[in-house]
Amino acid sequence: LCYYRHHAHGDPFLWPGLNDITAFVDFTAVAEAGFDAGLDVQGYTTQAQFLFNCGVLDCLARRGPQESAGYIRAARAVQRLTAPQEMGELFKVLALSRGLEGPLLGFARGDRLHAL
């Protein structure tokens, strides 16, 4: 599915470079293929939880005064990326690795490996 200016269409070659292209991913199949290839599944979570775990709110707080235009733009972007009704719950993050020790920051809380 593709989006251009908030309108859905099915041709990814229409307006190249300007479309947002969305794919529905079978993360269980990806995790299984990674495991079969000798990779470890390090974590699986929502985009929102991943960004919160990685400190997106701390980054936002460093943007400057909350009334500044830059802060307001950044806050809107964080809202769009993390809100459950926006991209926060719909988009997911899966990490595969080989030989990596220890937990990854992005999966410190809210890991959903059990859901795969």
Model-derived regions: residue spans:
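Long, Lys/Arg- and hydrophobic-enriched amphipathic alpha-helices
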Residues: 1-116
